[in-house]
């Protein structure tokens, strides 16, 4: 029996946020509800098994990368920060992630810091991480690749970049 195409599902997740600098160790972070968008591409079920977590603080860049990934028949979850991505991954709220594509420079935790945390985690270290940036800084690119990034893409990301990555990761 063929599965029907699914519309993007919106879930709401309650997460704890840590206090800013000077907050001390009192354990009191605020809690807030954060929407998480998961979109499955219609069509080929075998390809839609590929699940990509796209992380970028820019809503425009998130929409662009999600559109490119969906046009290649991949399921996409988008989040606005590396901190949120790590929380959702560690809590198992975005299951079966095959790849993480993250912006390098974001407020709070950077994409580089997310890369390091993923690679240090016994639970997450096998997930390929791709870094994106609009800045072509050779030592930054080298550092990310040395820390275990699968690739470093310059923005704007093109469909050919995504096709190349996904063919290597399958």
Curated annotation (Swiss-Prot):
Please report what switches on or represses expression of this protein: By cytokinin in roots, shoots and leaves. Induced by infection with the rice blast fungus Magnaporthe oryzae.
Function, as annotated, reads: Functions as a response regulator involved in His-to-Asp phosphorelay signal transduction system. Phosphorylation of the Asp residue in the receiver domain activates the ability of the protein to promote the transcription of target genes. Type-A response regulators seem to act as negative regulators of the cytokinin signaling.
Where is each Response regulatory domain found? 51-170
> Is Transcription set as a keyword in this record?
yes
InterPro entries with a match to the protein in the record: ARR-like, CheY-like_superfamily, Sig_transdc_resp-reg_receiver
Coiled coil spans: none
Q: How is it modified after translation?
A: Two-component system major event consists of a His-to-Asp phosphorelay between a sensor histidine kinase (HK) and a response regulator (RR). In plants, the His-to-Asp phosphorelay involves an additional intermediate named Histidine-containing phosphotransfer protein (HPt). This multistep phosphorelay consists of a His-Asp-His-Asp sequential transfer of a phosphate group between first a His and an Asp of the HK protein, followed by the transfer to a conserved His of the HPt protein and finally the transfer to an Asp in the receiver domain of the RR protein.
Q: What is this protein called?
A: Two-component response regulator ORR6
Q: Which domain of life is it from?
A: Eukaryota
Provide the free-text tissue specificity comment from this protein's UniProt record: Expressed in roots, leaf blades, leaf sheaths, shoot apex, flowers and panicles.
Task: Describe the inactivation phenotype.
Answer: Dwarf, narrow leaf, low tillering and sterility phenotypes.
Modification 4-aspartylphosphate, positions: 103
Q: Name the GO terms of the biological process aspect.
A: cytokinin-activated signaling pathway; phosphorelay signal transduction system
**Keywords of this entry:** Cytokinin signaling pathway, Phosphoprotein, Transcription, Transcription regulation, Two-component regulatory system
Please report which protein family the annotation says this sequence is part of. Belongs to the ARR family. Type-A subfamily.
Q: Which gene encodes it?
A: RR6
């Amino acid at each position: 029996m063929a599965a029907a195409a699914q519309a993007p599902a919106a879930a709401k997740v309650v997460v704890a946020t840590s206090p800013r600098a000077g907050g001390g160790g009192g354990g009191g972070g605020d809690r807030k509800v954060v929407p998480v968008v998961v979109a499955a591409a219609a069509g080929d079920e075998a390809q839609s098994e590929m699940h990509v977590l796209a992380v970028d603080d820019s809503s425009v860049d998130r929409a662009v990368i999600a559109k490119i990934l969906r046009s290649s028949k991949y399921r996409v979850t988008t989040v606005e920060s590396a901190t949120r991505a790590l929380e959702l991954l560690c809590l198992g709220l975005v299951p079966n992630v095959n790849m993480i594509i993250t912006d390098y420079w974001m407020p709070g935790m950077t994409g580089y810091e997310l890369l390091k945390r993923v690679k240090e985690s016994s639970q997450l270290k096998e997930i390929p991480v791709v870094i994106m940036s609009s800045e072509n800084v050779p030592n930054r690119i080298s550092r990310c690749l040395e820390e275990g990034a699968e690739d470093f893409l310059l923005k704007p990301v093109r469909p050919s970049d995504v096709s190349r990555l996904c063919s290597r990761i399958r």
